């Protein structure tokens, strides 16, 4: 029997080996300094990225097209060569992850050279402009323990539907079975979904590194959807997401995982719209949270915020949650507010809160 299996295996392998050269794609050498983007599909050479210049080359095979555009922060016209291939080399791009699309004769499609990512409310292409060694914090480190990211469905009584959530557990979770963990609820921004933090954002690698370096305590990170499907036929961003978080999600997580269930061990943070959902949820449920963070998502109205208008007083914002500064500081251990250097940030609002006497607040600007 073993000899028969061996013979069959040799025959199969021989067929595979002889078939491979005929199936292998023709790989053209890339221009000097360029490498395939880390977001590319397995056999795709393009888009290609130059880490030193931060430029990218995009390639689209569309011989019958009359116009092709790269849509990456704007519309960029691509040029066609004599083989029907369209090309463009960008100006230097900002480091980090970028969504993009390709418009062929005005119809926007994803670039089949890359994996797809859910952003701007559709499955688009993505490209990563890598940092240097300073970006190692979000890269996989083979020398440290790694946690798990679990994909879970739970039932929402508020929504009347099943909902999806991703949950990060630290590397020690399965071996340290008597230990309970604090929980961070981390909410995505508008146009993205609950997968963005772990895929585009490399959240798992970041948490693994912080925990291994002793810069973060081992914790559970819950990444829910910030959208609401109001009925089986319509998906919409409207609705009371706070009720789903508080009445459905938190009880489910506390029942399913070994969590510390008191407010001192529960935090919430969010990006953009997720930051606004975070402030709405936490400031209306101060008995359940002691830590809060917003990334480009803190807005009290007016005071340099989007839309202008008359600023509410610090005492009336969020139904008066800041009115008694000492009481706020007693309940909230940290209010972390961050924004990008290119954004119209909430610094004036933070300054007003500090002047009012709020001490447990940190403001940060990043690239």
Give the ranges of each region predicted by the language model.
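Positively charged n-region of N-terminal signal peptides that target proteins for export
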Residues: 1-4, 20
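Residue-level detector of intrinsically disordered/flexible regions characterized by low predicted structural confidence
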Residues: 4-5, 339
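Bacterial N-terminal signal peptides
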Residues: 7-15
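Residues in and immediately flanking transmembrane alpha helices
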Residues: 15-16, 201
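Non-catalytic cap/lid and distal C-terminal segments of serine-dependent acyl enzymes
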Residues: 21-25, 29-38, 44, 50-69, ...
């Amino acid at each position: 029997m073993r000899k028969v299996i061996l013979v069959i295996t040799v025959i199969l392998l021989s067929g595979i080996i002889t078939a491979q050269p005929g199936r292998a794609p023709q790989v053209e050498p890339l221009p000097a300094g360029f490498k395939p983007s880390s977001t590319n599909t397995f056999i795709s050479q393009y888009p290609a990225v130059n880490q030193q210049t931060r430029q990218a080359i995009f390639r689209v095979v569309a011989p019958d097209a009359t116009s092709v555009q790269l849509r990456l922060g704007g519309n960029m016209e691509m040029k066609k060569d004599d083989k029907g291939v369209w090309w463009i080399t960008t100006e230097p791009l900002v480091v980090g992850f970028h969504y993009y699309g390709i418009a062929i004769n005005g119809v926007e499609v994803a670039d089949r050279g890359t994996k797809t990512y859910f952003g701007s409310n559709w499955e688009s292409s993505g490209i990563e402009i890598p940092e240097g060694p300073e970006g190692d914090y979000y890269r996989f480190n083979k020398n440290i323990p790694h946690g798990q990211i679990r994909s879970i469905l739970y039932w929402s009584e508020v929504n009347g539907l099943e909902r999806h959530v991703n949950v990060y557990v630290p590397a020690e979770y399965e071996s340290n079975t008597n230990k309970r963990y604090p929980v961070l609820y981390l909410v995505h921004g508008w146009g993205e979904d609950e997968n963005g933090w772990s895929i585009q954002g490399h959240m798992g690698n970041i948490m693994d590194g912080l925990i291994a370096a002793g810069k973060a305590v081992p914790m559970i990170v819950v990444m829910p959807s910030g959208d609401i499907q109001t009925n089986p036929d319509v998906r919409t961003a409207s609705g009371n997401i706070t009720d789903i978080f508080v009445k459905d999600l938190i009880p489910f997580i506390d029942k399913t995982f070994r969590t510390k269930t008191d407010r001192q061990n529960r935090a919430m943070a969010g990006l953009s719209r997720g930051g606004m959902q975070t402030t709405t949820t936490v400031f209306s449920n101060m008995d359940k949270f002691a830590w809060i963070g917003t990334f480009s998502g803190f807005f009290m109205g007016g005071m340099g915020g989007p839309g202008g208008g008359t600023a509410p007083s610090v005492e009336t914002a969020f139904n008066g949650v800041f009115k008694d500064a000492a009481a706020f500081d007693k309940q909230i251990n940290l209010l972390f507010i961050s924004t990008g250097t290119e954004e119209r940030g909430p610094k004036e609002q933070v300054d007003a809160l500090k002047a009012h006497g709020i001490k447990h607040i940190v403001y940060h600007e990043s690239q």
